Each structure stands twice: as structure tokens, then as C-alpha cells.
Amino acid sequence: MKRSIKRLPKRTQEELAVLQELILSNLTNVRMIILYGSYARGKYVIWDETYDERGVTTYYQSDLDILVICDTRDANKAERHAREVIVPKYDTRMEGKRHPAPPNIIVETPVTINRAIRRKHYFFYEIIKDGILLYDNGTFQIGKPEKLPYREIKQYAEEE
């Protein structure tokens, strides 16, 4: 996992600093904050405007994808809190200074993350492989993928 956001645009770095501050002040027991997706991979789109053959204009802009790993009994509740409290606070703080795409924040527990990494769950495995670590309180170690027996792989596939 990468650890520097220096290659990102200055404005994006400022947005990430505000998001990190809001996450840390509004969620408890945060272990890690990871930027993933197009910004982490360096394939983000600042602004794209296209016109189709009928003259219809479409606009596209990459959003900020954030994974928060925290000790919580209810990751879904923490994620809802992020959507309902952190994102609106972010919108208010960054009004007129940010791009229109709201940040996408997902929240997971350390147990869920390590179970997914152990199983090489594509979504989380890619986040860990390509992501940028924004915050680490030093109390959580991300596990390593394991070579699983066929029986276990089949069981996981059936569960999902």
C-alpha cells in the first residue's frame, strides 16, 4: 500500500485532509483511513464533458473513495453515520472549493478486512494492493492473503 498523496492535485490533498479530520472527529476507534479507487490508482478524472450524436452533454468526475477501518459493533451504522453526518459537514466546509462529486465512505471492522484479505476477496484485496494509507493509529496490522484449499474457496464462493 502506498503512503503518499503528493502526486495528487493540491486541491485533492486539501479535500483529503478535511475528510480525514472529519472522520477522526466523528467516528470512534478509527484504526486506518485508506484512499482507494481512481485517485489511488492515478486514473482519476478531474472533469470530463462529452457530447453524444444527439447533442446531449454528459459530465463526469471521479469521486473520493475512502475505506475507514474501525472497531465498532455495527459497521453499517458507522457507515450510515458517515453518509448522514460526515459528508454533509464536508460539503459545508468545502463549499465552493470542492468538486461536486460527494465522497464515498465505507466502514469496515478489522476482523472483516482481515477475513476478506485472507480469502483474497477481490474488492478489499484491490483496495489494500492499490490504496493510499491516509491515517494509521498503529494498532492494526493488515493480514496477508493465504493459499486456501479448494473446499474453502468453494465455501466462500457459495456464501457470496
What are these regions (language model features)?
Residues 1-61, 70-160:
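Catalytic core of pol beta-like nucleotidyltransferases
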